[in-house]
Amino acid sequence: MSIKKYKREFILIGIIILLVGSVLLKNVLKKDSNIESPNKISQKKNNDIFPDIDNLTSWIVYWDLNVDNEINMLNKKLSSISYFAVNFNQNNDLIVPEKLEMYYDKTKSYNYEKYITIVNDIVNDDGISLLKDKEILNILLSDELSREKHINDIIDLVKEYGFDGIEIDYEQIKDDLALWENYILFINELYSEALTNNLKLRVVLEGNTPIDKLNFTEGPTYVMMCYNLHGSFSEAGEKSNQDFIKELMDKMKEVPGEKSFAIPTGGFDWKDNGSTKSVSEAEAEQILIENKIEAKRDDKSQYLYFNYTDKENIKHEVWYADQVTLEYLSQVIIEEGYDVSLWRLGGNLFSK
């Protein structure tokens, strides 16, 4: 065989190798582009979830942070997430739970606004907790100097971590009008400082807030909790329904400015021995599988419910929300032109 012929064959083989290599490389790169980074939520919009909502807000909680899949499914519909929650120690210092701090560090780059929620819970060094403590509010809000210090502490914390906004969720004030007066002064003063520091402010209100006796001012976004219709304090039933939400929307008409209405995920499991525990949609579905039973849907609320007897021969009644329930509850809010908030992420399947 001549040298020229060898050269032609070598050149031909080289061209074939280059062509095959380029095809293989293209396929590898294509495959790699479809692999999600473990620290980055996909930004693909899922139009099957809450099709009428493009401005959904929600919460994540420090004791249940297995929520990346839910964020991924809701995706661009999520305009903001509140990180729940900062509490107080026995010295009235603001404390960020370690797990929440770690999750925030992981999700700083995610494409939604990030609020930090502050609650009036006290967690002592000995582990004893005082939930929704009214006394600490009296201490923090009783006079201008105390409010100023508390506001400065909040602003410093938010700026240190780089949150986009503040959410205040101080509860169990009930009919204490003197405390409400100081609380509203605090909200107004905090809003002014938040504006100065280019921060947003949300204020969460309970359904029993005596709105007709109070003078809220325009500025913050006010979020009404549209749940606790049934719970550990009551007989079995839905956590919310459209009539209940309509009542709260009517009540909130006296509050000026932007408003959002929060609907609940999950539900409760009532035992006939008197005890009750909260359940997520995923937990309720697991009970159905284990007991080989099916849930029924309540016509009025669109909640799912079922009964079962456990291994200890104790009877249970379970009511919980799924995607159908949440979309049904949100519809009445959307029709009035308000924003929807979802309490909370964690244990939701979002599968009709």
Please report, for each region that a protein language model flagged, where it lies by residue.
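Short, acidic/polar
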Residues: 62-75, 144-159, 206-213, 321-332
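N-terminal Sec-pathway targeting helices
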Residues: 2-15, 27
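Glycan-binding loop/region signatures in secreted carbohydrate-active enzymes
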Residues: 123-136, 264-329
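Active-site groove signature of glycoside hydrolases
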Residues: 150-180, 228
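Catalytic domains of carbohydrate-active enzymes, especially glycoside hydrolases
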Residues: 67-90, 154-166, 332-340
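Substrate-binding surface in catalytic domains of secreted glycosidases
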Residues: 59, 90-98, 176, 181-288
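Glycan-recognition patch characteristic of GH18 chitinases/ENGases
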Residues: 27-148
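Hydrophobic faces of well-ordered beta-strands that scaffold small-molecule active sites
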Residues: 56-58, 79-83, 114-118, 166-168, ...
